Each structure stands twice: as structure tokens, then as C-alpha cells.
Amino acid sequence: MTRDVRQLFGTDGVRGRANFEPMTVETSVLLGKAIAGVLLEKHAGKHRVVVGKDTRLSGYMFENALIAGLTSMGIETLMLGPIPTPGVAFITRAYRADAGIMISASHNPYRDNGIKIFSSDGFKIGQAVEERIEAMVASKDFGKLPDDHAVGKNKRVKDATGRYIEYAKATFPKGRTLKGLRIVLDCAHGATYRVAPSVFEELDAEVICYGCEPSGCNINAGCGALWPSTIQKAVIEHKADVGIALDGDGDRLIMVDEKGHIVDGDMLLSICASDLKRRQALSDNRVVATVMTNFGVLRYLESLGIQVTISPVGDRHVLQHMLENQAVLGGEQSGHMIFLDYNTTGDGIVSALQVLRIMIESESTLSDLTACIAKSPQALINVPVTKKVPLESLANVQGVLKEVKEVLGDSGRILLRYSGTENICRVMVEGTKKHQVDSLAKTIVDVVEAEIGAEISE
């Protein structure tokens, strides 16, 4: 079956329910061959691709399928095993590989899986390369197959996680430790379940672990960055200094202060931007945030003399705007933070280390660091939908948006958008009064659910 261009790739690689198109073994083999074909178009000869994955049960079959496609075209593959997405980006550069592949659906439930592709420089491939891969999959024209003696070899890399652990620790100031800090750590039963505890423990922190027992079917299930309530309770129970919640593939970070209050990506971005400016390490005094960033946070950054470039939601868009504006720091409310001085993609562990460093150097608690940031009341509700109908075509939805805008006036805003990776419509309302914001968001949600809402299935 032929596919239209852009039918495979979404906003963050290929993603979908395991064993349903496009996330099938058959399509994964074709993707492996197409990735190889694109590499061989650049130049003939030897090529090397690293392949990592998170802890989903379906990761095994997609790992084998992709490697089969790659090696059938003469590509050498290096299996990294379970490793965070930023670890794949790092190892791709460290091993001078021609590409890196991460098998993960990030924060999605275990039933989903996905494929993210990195170029040799550790950045995610661009749209032009994605479209070339799609075209090859559709035509099944991957170029000449190698002779039987020239098929690729597959090797397992035993020290990949160890190298990533050392890299992450090296982003923390030499000679400093986390001694005296008690940390509650939630790894979402995901790709960081081995490396994150090791990083913080080897820096002498006392670590209390949650979400570190993956079964293949429990990744992101009531834990991790999407469910910080787990560590909110644990921080209070264990009298910890801080809580750290990562998502399934380790590129997101949400923290909890010593009082049990959630510190989201907006707040963490503000803390890190302020620190970089103080140290005169913030290029052009600029950070990149997104359309979802809280207005109170934007006002705080501007009060510090920090310029804010606004991008669409998604770490790919954040990175693009960072590169265009030569910014070294960017992030979004969901917890993606990119420190270009350290890595080419979001890295939850490295981001956490930077916040912990700031706490130690300033002799402050996390609540001290957030005390001066006054967030605007905001409601964000995810609505499961049956399909992503253009929102502008839904008369009732447009009608309620108009009504809510009239109520808010100039003192608030509404953002209604589909998720790029799930069948979800995100409803965000921001204003000056919490009860009003919550009520107006619920009003919009009710109409969206009536028009295109879906039953939640497990």
C-alpha cells in the first residue's frame, strides 16, 4: 500500500499504537531500509547507526525490525538497550555515528510507541529528510541491496548507559557534590530507571526512588512527569529537599519543592534563565519559550531584562527558534528544557542537575527560588477526541470561544490546540481570577467533548 507524503511522521517522529499502522513491524523494517537508503544517497561506503529504546514491551520487536531493515542495506548498527532519548543524541555524537534512533512514545501510555531519528550532529532530522524517508517507504525503492557478504553487522554496546551517566555528571561543577540533599526521584518506569538514580547517587545525594521497576506495561502509568502528585506526597512523607519527576524517555522534567508544591517547566526555565543571566552566560540575554508559557512567568523574565522569543509548542519548534536566535536556553511548560551548552535535545537529568546546582550555590531551597515568580491563574485541560477535525470548522466550538473571549476581555487569553502526538485537544485559559479561569475552561471543554469527544479506553 502506498502512502501519501507526511503520513508516517508527525510533530515528533513516527508515533502510534503498537501493532497498528504506522507502528507495525512491517513498516518499521521499511523505515530501517529507508533510513539506510537516505544515508547511502549521501555517500556510499560504511555507515553506523545507534539504536536505543525505552522500557515498553513493544520496544523489543521494533528494535529488531529497524535493525533488520538497516543491516539488510549494509548498515552497521549499535544496540544501546534502554537509555533516555538525550542519551541517544549524546551517544550518536560520541560514537561518531551517522544517525541515531530512539524507540519511544515519550510520555504516552505503554500501548503506544514511536521512532525518533537523530542526524550525526545529535539534532533531530528535519522535515526534508523525513519526507525523503517517507517517499522511499512509499515507493519501496531503497537503492541497490548489498551482496550477501556486505550486509551490516549488529553489535550490543555494553557501556552506553555508563558513558551517558558520566556525561550527565560532567555537566555538574567539578568538585561539587549533592551531599546533604535528600531527593525523591520518579523515573516513570521508563528509560531513566537505571541511569538517573546512578547520576544523583554518584554525586552523593540521598535518593529515594519511585517508578524504577519497569514491567514493559507500566511506563508513565500514574507516575513520572505527567503525574507529579506521586512525588508531592513522597517529598512530604520523606521530608525530602526536592522531588524530581522524569517522563518515559527522560527528556522532560517536573520538580516539587520541599513544601510539596509543583514547579513546572515555566518556573524551571525562569530559575535557569535568571542564573545564566547573573553569570553572564545567557546569549543575547534571550530565552525561547512557547505560546503556552504563563504570562506571569513572561512578565518575571522581562523584569529581569531577559528577552523572550515565543515559539509554537513542541521541543522541535523551541530548538528551531533557539538556533535561529542563537539562544542557549529554551523550554516549555510541560518540562522540556534545552541547554545547548550541554546537549542537542531536552534532557531531564541534566536540567535537574542545573537546578540543583543553583540551589546549592545560592544556598536556597527550591521554594526560595520560585517565591519571586507570580504566575497568572491558568487552567489546562486535555480532552480526548475521536479525530482532529479543524477547530475553525466547528461552529459551536468557535461560538463558545467568542463568548469566553468577551468575558475575559484584555485581562486573559485562550489557547485551543490539538496535541501533535496524541488524539487530544488541549484547552488552556488564562486570566486574573482562578475560579473564573477554571469555570471558563470547563465551559469550553463541555462543548469540545460534545462535538468531538472520545471515550477514554485503556
Curated annotation (Swiss-Prot):
It catalyses: alpha-D-glucosamine 1-phosphate = D-glucosamine 6-phosphate. Its EC number is 5.4.2.10. Activated by phosphorylation. The modification Phosphoserine is found at S106. Mg(2+) binds at S106, D247, D249, D251. InterPro entries: A-D-PHexomutase_a/b/a-I (IPR005844), A-D-PHexomutase_a/b/a-I/II/III (IPR016055), A-D-PHexomutase_a/b/a-II (IPR005845), A-D-PHexomutase_a/b/a-III (IPR005846), A-D-PHexomutase_C (IPR005843), A-D-PHexomutase_C_sf (IPR036900), A-D-PHexomutase_CS (IPR016066), Alpha-D-phosphohexomutase_SF (IPR005841). The active site is at S106 (phosphoserine intermediate). One of its GO terms (biological process) is peptidoglycan biosynthetic process. It comes from the Bacteria. Catalyzes the conversion of glucosamine-6-phosphate to glucosamine-1-phosphate. HAMAP family: GlmM_B. Belongs to the phosphohexose mutase family. This is Phosphoglucosamine mutase.
